[in-house]
Amino acid sequence: MALENPKMHNSEISKRLGAEWKLLSEAEKRPFIDEAKRLRAMHMKEYPDYKYRP
């Protein structure tokens, strides 16, 4: 979406992607949810003392 609309603000891209995400079925969302869990576990293993500090 960002490549197709290079001048679109990030907030608008996020809003549109969120709307598209809500339209997906659980089966369509599952691969993304599983990958997020896998990456989270990998990050926790590689960086056990990591603390988010904005």
Swiss-Prot record:
Residues 1-51 bind DNA. GO terms for biological process: brain development; negative regulation of transcription by RNA polymerase II; neuron differentiation. It is found in: Nucleus. Keywords: DNA-binding, Nucleus. It holds the Pfam family HMG_box. Coiled coil: none annotated. One of its GO terms (molecular function) is DNA-binding transcription activator activity, RNA polymerase II-specific. One of its GO terms (cellular component) is nucleus. InterPro entries: HMG_box_dom, HMG_box_dom_sf, SRY-related_HMG-box_TF-like. The keyword Transmembrane does not apply. PANTHER family: SOX DOMAIN-CONTAINING PROTEIN DICHAETE-RELATED, SOX TRANSCRIPTION FACTOR. This is SRY-related protein AMA3. It comes from Alligator mississippiensis (American alligator).
